[in-house]
Amino acid sequence: MTGGKSAGGKAGTTKNAQSRSSKAGLAFPVGRVHRLLRKGNYAQRVGAGAPVYLAAVLEYLAAEILELAGNAARDNKKTRIIPRHLQLAIRNDEELNKLLGHVTIAQGGVLPNIHQNLLPKKTAKTAGGKPASQEL
């Protein structure tokens, strides 16, 4: 009997390794999310589908925020997204603002807002361009 590895095993095991992220069509790492779920003591056991679903949700949220932040950067004629653009994107979107309402973004600033009572009053003019009469 010769030593070494036998040639037995399953037939046709020449498949290339494929990550769970690529199987799911995701850019976010499913394996890392699974490891963090296991080490985080959220539950005794973690199902196989849970990290895939969570990675997909995180990828969607990141894509949504980056899309809106990119639009904010383009509106400000910039090509690089800065924290200010993230702040504007999140605070101008109703659902993201609700989700991240208590989150502070460093160097994000605040939304420009002037209270209606502080704005100058509109003067009422007639169609002829003359000021409205004070007569009753």
UniProtKB/Swiss-Prot annotation:
Q: Where is this region: Disordered?
A: 1-23
PTM details?
Answer: Phosphorylated to form H2AS128ph (gamma-H2A) in response to DNA double-strand breaks (DSBs) generated by exogenous genotoxic agents and by stalled replication forks. Phosphorylation is dependent on the DNA damage checkpoint kinases MEC1/ATR and TEL1/ATM, spreads on either side of a detected DSB site and may mark the surrounding chromatin for recruitment of proteins required for DNA damage signaling and repair. Gamma-H2A is removed from the DNA prior to the strand invasion-primer extension step of the repair process and subsequently dephosphorylated. Acetylated by ESA1 to form H2AK4ac and H2AK7ac.
* The protein, known as: Histone H2A
Q: Which family does it belong to?
A: Belongs to the histone H2A family.
N5-methylglutamine modification sites?
Q107
Q: Name one GO molecular function term.
A: DNA binding
> Keywords, A to Z?
Acetylation, Chromosome, DNA damage, DNA repair, DNA-binding, Methylation, Nucleosome core, Nucleus, Phosphoprotein
Residues with the modification Phosphoserine, per the entry, are S133
Q: What does this protein do?
A: Core component of nucleosome which plays a central role in DNA double strand break (DSB) repair. Nucleosomes wrap and compact DNA into chromatin, limiting DNA accessibility to the cellular machineries which require DNA as a template. Histones thereby play a central role in transcription regulation, DNA repair, DNA replication and chromosomal stability. DNA accessibility is regulated via a complex set of post-translational modifications of histones, also called histone code, and nucleosome remodeling.
Q: What is known of its domains?
A: The [ST]-Q motif constitutes a recognition sequence for kinases from the PI3/PI4-kinase family.
Any single GO BP term: DNA repair
Question: Which residue ranges does the UniProt annotation give for the motif [ST]-Q motif?
Answer: 133-134
Q: In what ranges is there compositional bias, type Gly residues?
A: 1-11
Another remark in the UniProt entry says: In contrast to vertebrates and insects, its C-terminus is not monoubiquitinated.
Organism, scientific name: Botryotinia fuckeliana (strain B05.10) (Noble rot fungus)
Instruction: List cellular component terms (GO).
Output: nucleosome; nucleus
Keyword Phosphoprotein appears in the UniProt entry: yes
- Which residues make up the annotated site Not ubiquitinated? K121
Checking SUPFAM superfamilies in the record gives: Histone-fold
PANTHER family hit by this protein: HISTONE H2A (PTHR23430)
Q: Where does the signal sequence lie? A: none
